[in-house]
Curated annotation (Swiss-Prot):
One of its GO terms (cellular component) is 3-isopropylmalate dehydratase complex. The lineage of its organism: Bacteria, Pseudomonadati, Pseudomonadota, Gammaproteobacteria, Pasteurellales. It is an enzyme of class 4 (lyase). It comes from the Bacteria. This is 3-isopropylmalate dehydratase small subunit. The gene is leuD. Pathway: Amino-acid biosynthesis; L-leucine biosynthesis; L-leucine from 3-methyl-2-oxobutanoate: step 2/4.
């Protein structure tokens, strides 16, 4: 898995608070247990005019022409509230999002996002409002995320964010739980060699 050190991308301004996981990926799409294929169902109720997903809703921001190809989601407070379904970050990642910016995230959603190699950035409500205003006034322009410096550059302004050092290390180096375990493969092998045969 590639590390996420820096990222420049287009921003989708989702001007809504308390966006829950059922809005992100409705329950009827949760049958699969692999991480791919959920992007087309992202924000199903808002994004489409029909249950078969054949008609896009032209009034939903994700469908606006100027935001096609966006990789950064900007939202209001309490993003990802509701049930703990891991399919929510799967759907966001499968659509192409790599970074989310909001004043706050639901705890389980926040951790699930990090576990799925997405970067949720918490900024103050005032800072998020400033970014909304900039995005609306500068359609088509990208912003820059620097995880090494822990900064968000929007136009000529720099915002600083915080992230647990362990989580930062994992994202920078592209490590998931398996990757972390394999970093200690030699120590694990050495320990296993000392275990009595009847316990193996």
């Amino acid at each position: 898995m590639a590390g996420l050190k820096q990222h420049s991308g287009l921003v989708v301004p989702l001007d809504a608070a308390n966006v829950d996981t059922d809005a992100i990926i409705p329950k009827q799409f949760l049958q699969a247990i692999t991480r791919v294929g959920f992007g087309k169902h992202l924000f199903h109720e808002w994004r489409y005019l029909d249950a078969e997903e054949t008609q896009l809703n032209p009034d939903f921001v994700l469908n606006f022409p100027q935001y096609q190809g966006a990789t950064i989601l900007l939202a209001r407070k309490n993003l990802g509230c509701g049930s703990s379904r891991e399919h929510a970050p799967w759907a966001l990642a499968d659509y192409g999002f790599k970074v989310m910016i909001a004043p706050s995230f639901a705890d389980i959603f926040y951790n699930n996002s990090l576990n799925n190699h997405m970067l949720p950035i918490r900024l103050s409500e005032e800072e998020v409002e400033e970014i909304f205003q900039w995005v609306w006034a500068n359609e088509g322009k990208q912003i820059h995320i620097d995880l090494e410096a822990m900064t968000v550059t929007v136009g000529d302004k720099i915002y600083r964010f915080e992230l647990d050092e362990f989580r930062r290390h994992c994202l920078l180096n592209g490590l998931d739980n398996i990757g972390l375990t394999l970093q200690h493969e030699d120590a694990i092998t050495a320990y296993e060699s000392k275990i009595p045969a009847f316990l193996r």
